[in-house]
Amino acid sequence: METEIPVNEKETSFRRRVYTTIETLIDIENTDQLQEHLPHLHCLGWDEVVEERYVNKQCGFPSCQKAPPKITRNQMFEIDRKEGKIFEFRKQRAKFCSEMCYQKSSFVRKQLDEHPLWITGLTEARTQKVYEVPDESFVSPIAEKSEPVDSQFKKEPSIWLVTDSIIAKVQDMKLSEEAEEPKSLDPEDQDIEPFKLTDDDKDFIKSIKEFRNSNFGPPSTSKLLKTAPKPVLSAKDRKKEDEVLAKLRAKYGNKNALQKKPPILIEAQEIHSKLKTMEKAKEAWLVDLIKSWFTPETRKLVREGARPTGGAAEQILMDFLSGKKVDAEKLVNLPNLDKYNVKEKRLNIFLHSIRNHWMDLEARLHLTPTRRDILSRVASTFQLDSENITGWTKREINSIVIALFIVICLVDVELGDDYFKKDNASPELTAISNELCGLDSFQITGLHAAIKSQC
């Protein structure tokens, strides 16, 4: 029987093979060698090859012997304010000598596997796949940038023919007999003589007027609508009008003089008690679940914040300074009876059950992956058992993820200021939670207050 290789040794050998492939592709010369090594790479491994070649002052695409052009950058560094770190400002296109090499690299990267070799192993789909490596006849799907228009004018001067076009209708043109002199002149323009019409200009204006009148008729004069004044009634006619109005009022009555009835007020109906109890029950089970998770360590983490810890050494020193007595029996590391850590296993099951829903919330809120580390740190302090780690529906898991996000907002003060300003939920978080699990702004604010009271 063949002896099976341990999993750790397999993973180590696959990792070493990927690193060797990256080192080989740094100094590769032809595309045939490149095609042999592609089954060992994944997308991030290809990015490492491009980065290493760029650091070595080579074009990012393997088998290209040219160097990337030197580009003067206005911005050398990029600041991440939330993480408090400074990164070097780089663009992916600047790592290649031309647009063609950049398109070749993108073409090869799309064919690679997303998962690394040490996770998938040498599967048949990976080894038997035919990778296409672009050569010099490769046609880029994106056309190269054309030269600016100004440079074309400088290189090839040409004559531009402009067709005649009517700017305005002739009947709408307004021509003046004489040009009006400007009312006020600037002190700089006082020496310039005002423009005066010559005899030729007057003849030209006269001919245009004749052409307009012969083809379109004389210009229409603006007729102002004059409102006729109201006729003044004589005393006899006014008396007749009053008599007619009196007869009409006596016959039909003056409805405007009657007192209007007060409007009918209908009291708003109260929400059905069953709906109220359903809304309260929706928050009650979630608050009870959070209560079952919370431990003194969780409350301490919420109060102190997610500060970096010094590990076991710092914990021993803090226990000594606080005068805490250490139980000697607990210091003895006894083997587990069932060969694995139950608490760690439950924690992994819990994080795995909410992982996809949490990543969806991260993408919607544009959160950094470091918030996921805070989630793991907070969840490690929970009191988990077999009944409160899994077994929920998708809608319930979305509600649990929103509640866990509220807990992380209490731990991370900066994140809490962004989404719970003055203990009120932000419109962005309200819209997302309403879409995922049907929680509105009042329910999220009440859930935030309930969780905060437990800390």
Curated annotation (Swiss-Prot):
Statement: the UniProt record of this protein carries the keyword Zinc-finger: yes
Chain residues that bind Zn(2+): 59, 64, 97, 101
GO molecular function: RNA polymerase core enzyme binding; RNA polymerase II CTD heptapeptide repeat phosphatase activity; zinc ion binding
Keywords of the record: Hydrolase, Metal-binding, Nucleus, Protein phosphatase, Zinc, Zinc-finger
Pfam families, alphabetized: RPAP2_Rtr1 (PF04181)
Major place of residence: nucleus
The reaction(s) this protein catalyses: O-phospho-L-seryl-[protein] + H2O = L-seryl-[protein] + phosphate; O-phospho-L-threonyl-[protein] + H2O = L-threonyl-[protein] + phosphate
Signal peptide residue numbers: none
Zinc fingers, RTR1-type class: 36-121
Matching InterPro entries: Rtr1/RPAP2, Rtr1/RPAP2_dom, Rtr1/RPAP2_sf
Cellular component per GO, a single term: nucleus
Enzyme Commission number, as recorded: 3.1.3.16
Subcellular localization: Nucleus
Function noted in UniProt: Putative RNA polymerase II subunit B1 C-terminal domain (CTD) phosphatase involved in RNA polymerase II transcription regulation.
PANTHER family in alphabetical order: RNA POLYMERASE II SUBUNIT B1 CTD PHOSPHATASE RPAP2-RELATED
Family membership noted in the UniProt record: Belongs to the RPAP2 family.
Name the record gives this protein: Putative RNA polymerase II subunit B1 CTD phosphatase rpap-2
Organism: Caenorhabditis elegans
